Amino acid sequence: MVYAYGLRESIWNGFLKDADPLGFENVKSDEFLKAVVATFWERYGGKTYEGLKPKLAIYAAGVEEAATEVKPALERILANLGIPASKILLNVGDAKYTKNDDIRDFNNLDVPGTEGNEKQFIILVEKGKEGWNCRSLFAVALFRSPKSKIFVLQATMRCLRAITDERLTATVFLSKENYDTLDDELHKNFNMEIKDIKNPSNADRHKYQVRVLPPPRTITLKRGQ
């Protein structure tokens, strides 16, 4: 049997993580990253889910920004929090900055006991729009305006994949512009608002009772002569 659920119903009924979208005004790189890392670590630091450490994906606008601005800033922020820089993974699709070991670790983000699982701060450039499924991804941060508006929606969706049988919440960090873009894309693609992907109250959650009907029986009747 096949059941089709919309995005809203999938979140509200536990087939995806709940989402907590946070919008930031007057975004500047360092201030935004400090707030993002502090909130992420407060919510998810020290936790594991099915042996996997929670991950944060930080999307930069370009390769050079990712490597020369975001990564050094992130290293400083982690140092101030006592978090080792070895937890950073830079995957930007450029061999100058991303080596074979980095690609291996990226592919092992969801594999317990690997170096990839130890990486919790993933710096990306447009990676993960489609086809990237990382169950241990619990947050995304996107403060630059991407070339494609649909990318804001695609990046947000990456962190909603369910893990464990618990109700868990992913966090989405956005500039105010990207927050409004996400709301608009949800309207266009799912006929819903940004509030619909936030944590619903117990009163808003719907319980469905599924009853399987037996297959119909066919009886052949013979007409009397």
Locate each region found by the language model.
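Residues that line or immediately flank small-molecule/substrate-binding pockets and catalytic motifs
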Residues: 23, 126, 135, 141-144
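SF2 helicase motor core recognition
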Residues: 122-137, 155-159
